Amino acid sequence: MAGSQIKVPLPKPPDSDSQRLNAFPVIMAQEGKGRLLRQIRLRKILSGDPSDQQITFVNTYGFIRATPETSEFISESSQQEVTPVVTACMLSFGAGPVLEDPQHMLKALDQTDIRVRKTASDKEQILFEINRIPNLFRHHQISADHLIQASSDKYVKAPAKLIAGVNYIYCVTFLSVTVCSASLKFRVARPLLAARSRLVRAVQMEVLLRVTCKKDSQMAKSMLNDPDGEGCIASVWFHLCNLCKGRNKLRSYDENYFASKCRKMNLTVSIGDMWGPTILVHAGGHIPTTAKPFFNSRGWVCHPIHQSSPSLAKTLWSSGCEIKAASAILQGSDYASLAKTDDIIYSKIKVDKDAANYKGVSWSPFRKSASMSNL
């Protein structure tokens, strides 16, 4: 069994407003009872290289409703029927060119027609049928996808509420636009992340997030108490890269060896809203040969939180968060080695003070006080 862990203290980065990505405020329309106003959030995450092309990631949050039934006769005085909210939902429009006019983006959402269906293979899935999107987003990734299939627990807050025999539609309410450098758009192929071998050591990354929530809230029960009393602490892990096992029998491959490798890589971690809440890692130094497939040519990699922890990602839809700390953990790659060796932890991962916070949407699909019947 694995023994005790060795941990190097990490000094807390200086506080900064740019570390926070606050929640969308709840703003109700005056003319409509209980109707939430559509909102847009803009943020920039740049690589620092002036030659790097800028793009925009568009991510949407909203609600799934049953499609209204049509009657035989409709007059011009008939009010459009709005069905109750079934559950909250997230759908990424993907990357595309820079968009300039926020108000135009919000108005264009009226042209969106996205149908939602439930299906299953080895697990439950959600199928988004893209019937119509605004011309404004015609150069974004979603314009090339007529059908988007995804795991239901990653994109729908409460998939158990979707039942057979009902037609559903996705209504976008919140638009999150991230202007970023094109070099940031890199994710590791899933087969590479899942592969394990006795020939390498695995480097995992743990990011501790301070989530904005009340200690007596329902979500706080699944998290750790924040010793600073500023929210709750959630831990999320993902596979960062692999390191080749050293063959020099006279050398000690201990925490000092691992710390040296991490220092040379010069790792920095930040958070943004790209494929939903996403952890970004930048290796600004030397990347070992075995680790290079896990980063792009400029040393960047993105890890959407919903791939590692769908439940935490859905919590962040409606709650802001801040990166409290980040650590790299050296483990055996194959399970036999993992069970027999101790974790070696390197905690001196830099936190980008300008991009260490995530602003969620300050609504809750479980809060009964907010009526959304005519959104």
UniProtKB/Swiss-Prot annotation:
The protein's role, per its UniProt record: The M protein has a crucial role in virus assembly and interacts with the RNP complex as well as with the viral membrane.
UniProt cross-references to InterPro entries, sorted A to Z: Matrix_C, Matrix_N, Matrix_Paramyxo_C, Matrix_Paramyxo_N
Gene name of the record: M
Family the entry assigns: Belongs to the morbillivirus/respirovirus/rubulavirus M protein family.
Keywords associated with the record: Viral envelope protein, Viral matrix protein, Virion
GO molecular function (one): structural constituent of virion
Domain of life: Viruses
Annotated Gene Ontology cellular component terms: viral envelope
Protein name: Matrix protein
Matches recorded under Pfam families: Matrix_Paramyxo_C (PF23765), Matrix_Paramyxo_N (PF00661)
Gene Ontology BP term (one): virion assembly
Cellular location(s): Virion
